[in-house]
Amino acid sequence: MITPIATLMCANRDPDHLVARDASRQWRWGVFSNDVAQLAATLQRRPERRWLWANDCSYQFAVGLLALLHSGKTIVLPPNTQSGTLATWASQCDATLDATLLTSGNSGHAVDPRCFASLDTHTACIELATSGSTGAAKIVAKTLGNIDSELASHQQLGFIPAHCDLLFSTVSHQHIYGLLFRTLMPLARGIPYWSSSHAYPEHVFADIAHYSQHAALISSPAHLNRLPPALDLGHYATHLDCVFSSGGPLSADAAQQLGNQLGHYPIEILGSTETGGIAWRQQRDSHSRWRALPGVETRSDNDQQLLEVRS
């Protein structure tokens, strides 16, 4: 079951439901709903419309994102949290959300969901940067309707099992893939997620084995194509139920290494900021083909060497 982000804060979830955690702290729904409500109330008193938002902690990022949406702001996500990048992007916005405004509440009691109104899926908007792989990076606006539709499309395929108990990631939520899979999908599904990023495969697999029995890993070829040869993935097979990869081509060797040692092949997602998700595959062998995601139609123009996408 998936809850649209448009109605997420209206959901009557158990205050003790685990939202996110790291090695030293856990955040539950009662605290999360209070944090979002308090920040949204602060932001509603501010006149600025376009807000820059970047934060490396996925819990704080989610609080800021939901609070900005529920205060009627347009969110601009820069491609990273580096100071130079933030300074450049801040000049295109009315204000920057300061992490010091995010003071986690002490109350464990969830805010009455009736305090939140459903978000307008046509006007609520998040702006993201493209990768710049085909030229200079540009801003692409995604309505909440676009985002909820894409989450529902991925949910139809059922890749993340219902019994998943913790989601880990090696990718940033500042980009569309990480935004959807690292932050919004677990919130919509009610799956707890690890709040910090892992820079090294050894660290993420160690935490998976220590903290989870049925984990999901959101990753990319930048990490999966470079797994250390000495890393025994079979040691983690009973703790890791699924691996996702996006952001570039995953090598056949990496796919086979993961599949042979974990007992399941990584799920590759093809897409871009502009198009959203297009297709998926699992490289079980050299004949594995891409399959269109639910609701996506594709057509190839061989003469122009173009792929036309409609969703």
Give the label of every model feature segment.
Residues T100-A124, A141, S149-L151:
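Flexible, low-complexity linker/hinge segments
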Residues T3, M9-P15, V111-A129, I160-L167:
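Conserved pre-ATP/AMP-binding loop-to-beta segment of ANL
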Residues E297-S311:
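AMP-binding/adenylate-forming core of the ANL superfamily
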Residues R28-W29, C125-A152:
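Conserved AMP-binding A3 loop
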Residues S91-L101, A141-L157, A162-R226, I267:
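AMP-binding/adenylate-forming
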Residues D14-R45, K142-G145:
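Conserved AMP-binding/adenylate-forming core of the ANL superfamily
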Residues P229-H287, E297-R299:
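Gly/Ser/Thr-rich phosphate-binding loop
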Residues A41-T81, C164-H173:
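Conserved AMP-binding/adenylate-forming
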